[in-house]
Amino acid sequence: MEKNMGIERGRFISFEGIEGVGKTTALNWVREQLDAARIPYVVTREPGGTPIAEAIRDVLLSHSDEMMCPDTELLLMFAGRAQNIAHVVLPALRRGQWVLSDRFTDASFAYQGGGRGIPVKHIEELAGWVLGNLKPDLTLLLDAPVSVGLCRVKSRGAKDRIEAEGLEFFKRVRECYLALANQEPARFRVIHTDQDLSNVKNQIMKAIKPLLTASPLPGEKTEIEGL
């Protein structure tokens, strides 16, 4: 990756949370705001975002007779992430576009760290290699009780390999997400989604407002280290 470039930098928002907490709905609300403000953006997801990363996603989420070990899951997540960063995230930020990502690296700390029990130091090593110091400007952590999220997932029909995990797994994932938010309060905004939708939307609009008002003008240069 290129290092220490002065670029026309867009804003980077990630949407995190366990299954069934409303990430897609929240992302679409933000898209509406960007459309109204005529701010260019791209939408991506993890795992996924490019043809190779989507193929990795299929491997990660498909049921198989062969059990996937936690280390394999983590390494595949970062392989897909490397593709997504190289071919979607960085090019968009360099063009001055905003990036809206349905999950990013925090998901690996929550799912493979909290859920699978992989030591944090291993995830940090991979993150340092693949990301440099790239982080979202804002992370919206959509949060609801695990029972609420899993009930919503059940209503969708067939579950993928990760959605099929049990209650205790998702409790660990949720606890890890909330711990991450406590560690980085400047970046995270925790949005409780087990309430009236209008209240949820208002919280999200309030969270993104500082980025909208501080959005750089076309041609404005912003230094990003580690890219």
Swiss-Prot record:
UniProt cross-references to SUPFAM superfamilies, sorted A to Z: P-loop containing nucleoside triphosphate hydrolases
Superkingdom of the source species: Bacteria
Amino acids binding ATP: 17-24
Catalytic reaction annotation: dTMP + ATP = dTDP + ADP
Keyword Disulfide bond annotated: no
Top-level class of the enzyme under EC nomenclature: transferase
Keywords: ATP-binding, Kinase, Nucleotide biosynthesis, Nucleotide-binding, Transferase
GO molecular function, one term: dTMP kinase activity
GO CC annotations, alphabetized: cytoplasm; cytosol
EC number: 2.7.4.9
A Pfam family this chain is assigned to: Thymidylate_kin
Single GO BP term: dTTP biosynthetic process
Family annotation (HAMAP family): Thymidylate_kinase
Family affiliation: Belongs to the thymidylate kinase family.
PANTHER family documented for this protein: THYMIDYLATE KINASE, UMP-CMP KINASE 2, MITOCHONDRIAL
Alphabetized NCBIfam families for the sequence: DTMP_kinase
Protein's job: Phosphorylation of dTMP to form dTDP in both de novo and salvage pathways of dTTP synthesis.
The protein's name in its UniProt record: Thymidylate kinase
